[in-house]
């Protein structure tokens, strides 16, 4: 887990940074974003590495730092015994949190389950100059019979973070690293903010036809409105000189987006001698439509600073912008894979094919044109 900032739920994976865009939630990619990831509705998180991850359903990503692996997330489901917990937390410099966790099973055979998790978070973090205001509610509803399992996960979240940027980029002329500063230093400027609200859902259907054949269907969607994003250097971080000095530049932005995904497939279970085979054939499609800011000007110099005394702001951060379509991307893929097990040995053999179309939008005189690639 990468430390230093609460803005993104970043992980380092094989030396490369990844975030929510590479998370699979209940086998559905793309419903989380690169912004701060909600953890309270998550039951487990598993890192899947290696070339075999390419045979899973393919989502539409908008981050280029794909590390050759995925983070597989399973959401909380209703346990066999009823749970009803209310928790209050205090941390940082007065960051107050409230969490509700309710789960229960219903029906003659406890075939229905409901799990609801909520968050209310407000206050200042342990990092100076960083404040959080966040609310969210997620629900997981599952239904299980002898041969069929359905699971619906749906939720809404609002999150506003003021300050918090602690990313630095070395200037091209730097030949040695600056001296290490105090970890408590504040590098926020007035008007630094990242704010988003939106909802997501996933649906999974698993069907057992007989002892040799299974079928599955996965669906997911997301509506996320990152409607305020005022960060240093357009969000990429401060550029450091060799002596630790920096220039504070900023411009406002936003990236509202919508995302859809579906996958259908079947799995066969057979043995050849002592080798067990689980052979899966699947097909999926995914769409991501994304807007970006315009009429937001270029980067504005609003002050100076350094690693040791913080930020010295001389101008107010810019705030004016509008949004319009930036790109629309669609991808479809086919996968065939054989998971083979022999005693303590495991092997994976698979083939995968995908096709993608991306339409970028150029604007001139208030009209748009598509560029397909």
Where are these regions (language model features)?
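Outer-membrane beta-barrel proteins
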Residues: 75-77, 104-108, 122, 141-147, ...
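Face-selective signature of the C-terminal outer-membrane beta-barrel domain
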Residues: 201-224, 246-363, 371-373
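Hydrophobic, lipid-facing positions within transmembrane beta-strands of outer-membrane proteins
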Residues: 9, 69, 82, 96-100, ...
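Outer-membrane beta-barrel translocator/receptor signature
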Residues: 40-43, 52-137, 145-150, 199
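Repeated loop/turn-to-beta-strand initiation elements of outer-membrane beta-barrel proteins
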Residues: 79-83, 110-114, 147-152, 212-215, ...
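Short sequence motifs at beta-strands and strand-loop junctions characteristic
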Residues: 5, 91-94, 129-133, 191-197, ...
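Acidic, small-polar-rich N-terminal luminal/periplasmic segments of exported/outer-membrane proteins
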Residues: 1-80
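Acidic/polar loop-and-plug regions of large Gram-negative outer-membrane beta-barrel proteins
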Residues: 125, 138-208, 223-257, 301-321
């Amino acid at each position: 887990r990468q430390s230093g900032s609460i803005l993104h739920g970043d992980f380092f994976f094989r030396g490369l940074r990844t975030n929510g865009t590479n998370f699979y939630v209940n086998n559905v990619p793309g419903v989380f974003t690169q912004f701060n990831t909600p953890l309270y509705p998550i039951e487990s998180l598993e890192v899947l590495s290696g070339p075999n991850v390419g045979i899973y359903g393919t989502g539409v990503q908008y981050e280029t730092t794909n590390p050759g692996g995925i983070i597989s997330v399973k959401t909380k489901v209703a346990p066999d015994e009823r749970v009803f917990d209310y928790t209050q937390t205090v941390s940082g410099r007065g960051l107050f949190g409230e969490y509700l966790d309710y789960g229960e099973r219903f029906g003659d055979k406890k075939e229905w389950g409901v799990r609801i998790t909520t968050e209310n978070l407000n206050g200042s973090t342990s990092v100076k100059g960083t404040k959080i205001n966040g609310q969210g509610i997620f629900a997981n509803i599952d239904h299980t019979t002898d041969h069929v399992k359905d699971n619906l996960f749906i939720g809404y979240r609002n999150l506003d973070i003021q300050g918090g940027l602690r990313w630095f980029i070395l200037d091209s002329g730097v030949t040695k690293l600056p001296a290490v500063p105090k970890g408590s230093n504040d590098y926020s400027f007035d008007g630094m903010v990242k704010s988003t609200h939106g909802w997501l859902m996933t649906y999974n259907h698993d069907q057992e036809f007989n002892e040799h054949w299974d079928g599955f269907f996965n669906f997911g969607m997301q509506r996320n409105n990152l409607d305020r994003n005022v960060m240093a250097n357009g969000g990429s971080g401060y550029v450091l000189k060799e002596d630790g000095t920096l220039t504070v530049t900023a411009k406002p932005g936003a990236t509202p987006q919508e995302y859809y995904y579906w996958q259908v497939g079947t799995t066969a279970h057979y043995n050849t001698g002592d080798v067990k085979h689980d052979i899966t054939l699947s097909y999926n499609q995914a769409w991501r439509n994304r807007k970006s800011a315009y009429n937001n000007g270029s980067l504005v110099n609003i002050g100076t600073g350094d690693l040791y005394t913080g930020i010295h702001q001389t101008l107010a951060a810019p705030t004016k912008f509008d949004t319009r379509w930036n790109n629309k991307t669609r991808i479809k893929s086919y996968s065939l894979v054989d998971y083979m097990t022999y005693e303590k040995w495991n092997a994976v053999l698979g083939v995968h094919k995908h096709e993608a179309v991306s339409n970028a939008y150029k604007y001139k005189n208030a009209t748009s044109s598509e560029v397909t690639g």
